[in-house]
Regions:
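Short hydrophobic/aromatic-rich beta-strand segments that constitute the beta-sheet cores
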Residues: 31-34, 53
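Short, solvent-exposed loop/turn motifs
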Residues: 9, 37-39
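DPxDG-like acidic metal-binding loop motif
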Residues: 1-32
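An extended, acidic
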Residues: 39-94
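A broad, low-specificity signal marking well-ordered, structured residues that form hydrophobic/aromatic
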Residues: 23, 36, 49
Length: 94
């Protein structure tokens, strides 16, 4: 759930029922997971990074599904995660 004020994303919350975690963020207040402050990872090298992605529900809908790029990057990173939820993928960037 999010709130935009004058076209600017200002407040947001994401709940992960599987892990019972609540992510919240607001402009000027930072972000939290279960009230603990979180921040974006400081990892700078691709080989130490976790690749998070998703694919279209119906792979036959489009021929440009970035599969070749995904395969290439898979071998350059620490690992791959496909959660099925874009909002959770973004929350776990921190």
């Amino acid at each position: 759930v999010g709130l935009m004020i004058d076209g600017v994303p200002s407040v947001g919350a994401i709940y992960d029922p599987a892990r019972q975690e609540l992510f919240r963020a607001a402009i000027g207040l930072g972000a939290t997971c279960d009230r603990r402050p979180i921040r974006v990872s400081q990892t700078t090298e691709l080989r130490n990074s976790l690749l998070v992605t998703g694919f279209a529900y119906d792979r036959h809908q489009t021929t440009d599904h970035n599969y070749a790029e995904f395969c290439y990057l898979t071998h350059l990173t620490q690992g791959v995660r496909r959660s099925g939820s874009a909002s959770m993928d973004l929350a776990y960037v921190a």
